[in-house]
């Protein structure tokens, strides 16, 4: 039995979906433990593309059990739409292969409205750059103990009471502070009770279910969303998401004890990208950045927004390794850098004339850091589909070796293309 956690080490979009899909071959179960439908995982299997937002990537493989943990915030309408889309392409979903934690907090229509109204009021200069899908306001309600959970839909009187109390506050804010329309209780109540009936067969007390699976010796893969620099505590606050994106979130977001985790794999893009607002020390606003964006198809799977691109930042990935306790890293999208005459990696920062190897908590400081770069020769040869280390161009090998040196965590997996077959496995996390 092994419990493996997969986390992003940058600002999300590192390519976690493909690696989860790859490792699901050895897993019996895949558990999504945080985030919502603001995150998107893109998989390419046998030339067919799948984009998932809530359902764990393991759902594509027959015979695997998947679960949405209590750390996720769930929009029932978005989940049902995703299930329907998967059914259209032949992926059958049933209570046999998908469970949803009964403690999962629900995103309601007013969460979306609050999210969008807040961004609008902040304006272009100060907005966070959220997806506007209600993630932050839902987590806010959860922390304030006014959240509505999946289990509440099966007690209609309690659900209506909670909804009424919340709407008293929400409608006051929307109408009087944001000058937006409010909501009618009956409309939300009826829609959510109907969707609750549809999801009832999937509802599960997840912690005992996972405990039983561990007792039976099953391999469990825990799938994170976003990345460590979007973590609500250790990210570039306030330009972050509202959940725990590091490895500790796998425990609080599923009910599995910390001592049960065996291996933490960090997914690392060979360069760096970010969607939305916030500091980005190695951002490239030049031809190299445009090259990476175009060749890497750097557009968000959820929003379609173009991603900001930059050189690899070892300070950021070391920070991620520290807070998640990484055992190994998986490098993705190395092939995107094929054809560049030279490549650079950031090994440290200079702030107000002083060098540091750490990500400062002060966002204003991070905004003005000067990256300390090492420049290395690029490679003209293609790395696409390389499955042996010796097949990689010498310059690509040198780049990866230096990357490992400055990060301090060994490479477990190297991805050289979008398909699951385009992968070089150095150490399988389930066999570590």
Swiss-Prot record:
Pathway assigned to this chain's UniProt record: Purine metabolism; AMP biosynthesis via de novo pathway; AMP from IMP: step 1/2
Positions of IMP binding: 13-16, 38-41, 131, 145, 226, 241, 305
GO MF annotation terms: adenylosuccinate synthase activity; GTP binding; magnesium ion binding
Binding site for GTP: 12-18, 40-42, 307, 333-335, 415-417
Cofactor: record remark: Binds 1 Mg(2+) ion per subunit.
SUPFAM superfamilies: P-loop containing nucleoside triphosphate hydrolases
InterPro entries, sorted: Adenylosuccin_syn_GTP-bd, Adenylosuccin_syn_Lys_AS, Adenylosuccinate_synth_dom1, Adenylosuccinate_synth_dom2, Adenylosuccinate_synth_dom3, Adenylosuccinate_synthetase, P-loop_NTPase
Principal localisation: cytoplasm
Keyword Protein transport: no
One term under GO cellular component: cytoplasm
Binding site for substrate: 301-307
The entry's keywords: Cytoplasm, GTP-binding, Ligase, Magnesium, Metal-binding, Nucleotide-binding, Purine biosynthesis
EC numbers on record: 6.3.4.4
Enzyme class: ligase
Pfam families named in the record: Adenylsucc_synt (PF00709)
Catalytic reaction(s) noted: IMP + L-aspartate + GTP = N(6)-(1,2-dicarboxyethyl)-AMP + GDP + phosphate + 2 H(+)
Family: Belongs to the adenylosuccinate synthetase family.
Summary of the function given for this chain in its UniProt record: Plays an important role in the de novo pathway of purine nucleotide biosynthesis. Catalyzes the first committed step in the biosynthesis of AMP from IMP.
Protein name, per record: Adenylosuccinate synthetase
């Amino acid at each position: 039995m092994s419990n493996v956690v997969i986390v992003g080490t940058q600002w999300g979009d590192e390519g976690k979906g493909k690696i989860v899909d790859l490792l699901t071959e050895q897993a019996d179960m895949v558990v999504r433990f945080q985030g919502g439908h603001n995150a998107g995982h893109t998989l390419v299997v046998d030339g067919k593309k799948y984009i998932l937002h809530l359902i764990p990537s393991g759902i594509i493989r027959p015979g695997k059990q998947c679960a949405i943990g209590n750390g996720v915030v769930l929009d029932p309408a978005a989940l049902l739409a995703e299930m329907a889309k998967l059914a259209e392409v032949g992926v059958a979903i049933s209570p046999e292969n998908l469970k949803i934690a009964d403690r999962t907090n629900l995103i309601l229509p007013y969460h979306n409205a609050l999210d969008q109204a807040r961004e609008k009021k902040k304006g272009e200069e100060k907005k966070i750059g959220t997806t506007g899908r209600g993630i932050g306001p839902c987590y806010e309600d959860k922390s304030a103990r006014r959240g509505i959970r999946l289990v509440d839909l099966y007690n209609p009187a309690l659900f209506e009471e909670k909804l009424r109390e919340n709407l008293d506050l929400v409608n006051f804010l929307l109408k009087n502070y944001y000058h937006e329309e409010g909501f009618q209780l009956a409309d939300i109540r009826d829609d959510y009770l109907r969707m609750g009936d549809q999801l009832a067969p999937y509802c599960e007390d997840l912690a005992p279910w996972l405990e039983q699976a561990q007792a039976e010796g099953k391999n469990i893969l825990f799938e994170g969303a976003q990345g460590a620099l979007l973590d609500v505590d250790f990210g570039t606050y306030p330009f972050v998401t509202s959940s725990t994106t590091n490895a500790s979130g796998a425990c609080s977001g599923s009910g599995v004890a910390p001592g049960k985790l065996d291996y933490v794999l960090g997914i690392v893009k060979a360069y760096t990208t970010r969607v939305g607002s916030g500091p980005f020390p190695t951002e490239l606003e030049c031809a190299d950045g445009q090259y990476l964006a175009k060749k890497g198809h750097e557009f968000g799977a959820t929003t379609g927004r173009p991603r900001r691109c930059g050189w690899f930042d070892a300070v950021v990935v070391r920070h991620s390794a520290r807070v998640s306790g990484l055992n190994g890293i998986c490098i993705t999208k190395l092939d995107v850098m094929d054809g560049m005459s030279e490549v650079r990696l950031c090994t440290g920062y200079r702030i107000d004339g002083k060098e540091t190897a750490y990500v400062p908590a002060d966002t204003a400081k991070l905004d003005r850091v000067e990256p300390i770069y090492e420049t290395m020769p690029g490679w003209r040869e293609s790395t696409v589909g390389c499955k042996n280390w010796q097949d990689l161009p010498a310059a690509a090998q040198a780049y990866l070796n230096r990357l490992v040196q400055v990060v301090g965590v060994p490479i477990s997996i190297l991805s050289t293309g979008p398909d699951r077959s385009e992968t070089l496995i150095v150490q399988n996390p389930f066999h570590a």
